[in-house]
């Protein structure tokens, strides 16, 4: 199965957000059904997790919460939704026989990845809040974690949105030139 994700190098909560995308002008949900979930679990390197309707519902809920929190930091309802997801699990620290270990415990296995995504979002909010951004591309709904040195990444990808923006600017300039000349 080819990787269906539009951006392969993003952290889990951003990966989750980017399951809602626009392809060929249509809104697509990579997590529309259990088959989609199975493919996505493989793509994010977690093929061992069961692709179940309950897991799908948990990820939908986490996705809405992550989106709400990122789109509007003052959205209390989104914050409560995220906290409800986080409430379903915890990370336990222990010294295992192979050394220090941190074990994620969830009440219901279906919540595991949703919990991990919410927890990873907290980590990103602690250190990199301003580097979690939506693509500036016209009609693009993708998000990214800007890990560039300058912290000025604008586009999900230079090859798509970046080039389209450049072409539009160029087009606007040449139209300008015609009007003046
Ligand atoms: Zn984009």
Model-derived regions, located:
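Short helix-coil boundary/hinge micro-motifs
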Residues: 1-134, 138-142, 178-181
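Residue-level signal for short amphipathic helical patches enriched in basic/charged
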Residues: 73, 147, 162
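Short amphipathic alpha-helical interaction/hinge segments
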Residues: 93-94, 148, 169
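Residues immediately within or flanking Cys/His clusters that coordinate Zn2+
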Residues: 130-137, 153, 158, 164
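Short linker/helix segments within small regulatory modules
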Residues: 146-153
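Basic DNA-binding region of bZIP-type proteins
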Residues: 159-178
